[in-house]
Amino acid sequence: MVRPWVFCLLLFPCSSAYSDSWMPLVNLTQHLLQEANSSFSSNCWVCLSIQTQRSLAMPAPLRTWTETPMKLRIMYSARTLSGPYPITDLERRLQNFQPLTPHSSFVNPDQRAIAFLQITSVTGILPILSRITSVRYPDDHVYESAQRPIWGSLSTQTILTSQAPLCISRFFKNSNHATFVGKLPASLCNHTFQLSPSANHQSIDLSSSYAFAPLMAMPGSKWRNPLRFSGPPSLNSGMPHYSCPIDDIHCHTYPTTPWRSCPSFPASTCYNLTLFEPDNSSHPITLSVDTTYFKIKLQGHKDPYPLFQYQPLMGAALSGQYSIWEYEPTVKKNGGITPNIFSHLVSLTYSFCLNSSGVFFLCGNSTYVCLPANWSGVCTLVFQYPDIELLPNNQTISVPLFATVPSSVPASRRKRALPLLPLLAGLGIASALGLGIAGITTSTVYFQQLSKALSDSLDEIATSIISLQDQIDSLAGVVLQNRRALDLIVAERGGTCLFLQEECCFYINQSGVVRHAARKLRERASELGTSSSSWIQWLGLGPWLPSWLTSLMAPILFILVLLVFRPCLLNCLTHSVSRRMSSFIHTTTEGHVDKILLLRESQYKRLPQEPPEEDAV
């Protein structure tokens, strides 16, 4: 199988910094080779594969699990607002409804859903199930869902180079409700956290919930019905656990959810783990895991809070679908009350995306930036890089630098490929001159015909190429317009390529190269046409005479012919003129001579005075 390369670069002992986007990979490769004291670090070919679906991955260190932020994207839907819609456009959609004040006398549950969304939007506690913090970021305010996510796998043939220190696993009892992203084998995970989405529900009194305290304190708010939420996920490490210490300092900067109390009571469950880094097996690292907030803290490292509210473990655990119901007591005609009747208000879908460049989730053989809401499988954090191969500097590379060679083309075919037109021209000349001196006249005539046919063919080819290039330019313009329109239509899903989960294809305009080649073909055709129509070439004198003398051959030969045949021409001309003159004189004077002789022989007589008689006539 022929390996396709995007480029190959020769490394030297002293490589300077490069500004190109792909050069950091080459510099990093050389740095790693130098640290490993490899012989390839001083002089070798570094080749990067152009196959975007194939890549290599290195396990991320444990500090990446604590210092890598994540972005939360929330989609909501209700019966009145059928979705799902991004939570960021909630205020715009709520403008289509009249302001409502929630109270228990609402009969229509859709009105209560709109009222619930309006109240939570006005109080500024959206996203409803996300963190509640006084820290406001200038880019997205309190929302962490403004960034457009990148859905789907980035590569599907990723190979993990070594064992990961930490993995996360999550599976659903009903696989129909899950999105399987991939599964890493147990041998590639030093330790695995087991995440379990809960199917239970929790009813919360709004008056006792920190998250909804501003809602209950609003003037005119008469909402007294309890709410029911989807239950929280759980984490199991399989290790001995203990009660986590209560943290009052950073309590309000944690990802608070309606089923959380701040500070947590009872105390959260924590695990202590001793793990090894991928590149350092002699110095273990101890970490603690809070199963309530899904928080990882490394011993001897500074707590990243409140700077980063969502860790990768939090995002992986909280990803899912959540629903909110309202307890709706029904009053019968006889005055009785039917309890435990809940009406659905809102459904929320949580999806988390890594917000740090260079860090990816590896699930099985696929890498992701965003985990789907109901993801299932076994994943870990990795650093991804393209497939890089090293070749000795004395090895010949069969493809040019910065060239793309399709893998479907055999190497033998690529080596046999020769330019067609020069090859045909060479064969024509060889066949014309191969008959020798005996057949030089005949072969020259045949070669003239072949050259004329080749000239016509080149001109037709050039015309066809220009016509095809015009069609391609026109088609490319239409395709690019359609591409821009499709990107606008699916902009919320990341654009056309991400929506289709395919590689992006871009049009590279090579019209300049094509038109230049066509111009060369026309020039070649013109030269061949001129050579074919020249009678000097037909005489076989062209190659042995200079060009300036060739242009004077016609008048010189004409003058020489006149000088050589001048006496004959003059004699012929004189004789012809004399003969023509004699003939002319003879024809002109012959009648006049006869009349003169006739006049000499006749005699003069007197004319009669009387009229002649009739019988005399």
Curated annotation (Swiss-Prot):
Disruption phenotype: Embryonic lethal with no survival beyond stage 14.5 dpc. Embryos show retarded growth but otherwise have no significant morphological defects. Placental development is abnormal with significantly reduced vascularization of extraembryonic tissues. In the placental labyrinth, there is an expansion of trophoblast cells which reduces available space for fetal blood vessels. Trophoblast cells fail to fuse and form syncytiotrophoblast layer I (SynT-I), however development of syncytiotrophoblast layer II (SynT-II) is not significantly affected. It comes from the Eukaryota. CDD domains: HTLV-1-like_HR1-HR2 (cd09851). GO terms for cellular component: plasma membrane. Keywords: Cell membrane, Cleavage on pair of basic residues, Developmental protein, Disulfide bond, ERV, Glycoprotein, Membrane, Signal, Transmembrane, Transmembrane helix. Residues 1-17 form the signal peptide. Residues 566-617 are cytoplasmic. Synthesized as an inactive precursor that is heavily N-glycosylated and processed likely by furin in the Golgi to yield the mature SU and TM proteins. The cleavage site between SU and TM requires the minimal sequence [KR]-X-[KR]-R. Coiled coil: none annotated. Residues 18-544 are extracellular. Pfam families: TLV_coat. Residues 420-440 are annotated as: Fusion peptide. Highly expressed in placenta where it localizes to syncytiotrophoblasts of the labyrinthine zona. Specifically localizes to syncytiotrophoblast layer I (SynT-I). Also detected at very low levels in hippocampus, brain, testis and ovary. Belongs to the gamma type-C retroviral envelope protein family. This endogenous retroviral envelope protein has retained its original fusogenic properties. Together with Synb, participates in trophoblast fusion and the formation of a syncytium during placenta morphogenesis. Syna is essential for placental development and is specifically required for formation of syncytiotrophoblast layer I (SynT-I). Promotes muscle myoblast fusion. Does not have immunosuppressive activity. The mouse genome contains a high percentage of proviral-like elements, also called endogenous retroviruses (ERVs) that are the genomic traces of ancient infections of the germline by exogenous retroviruses. Although most of these elements are defective, some have conserved a functional envelope (env) gene, most probably diverted by the host for its benefit. This is Syncytin-A.
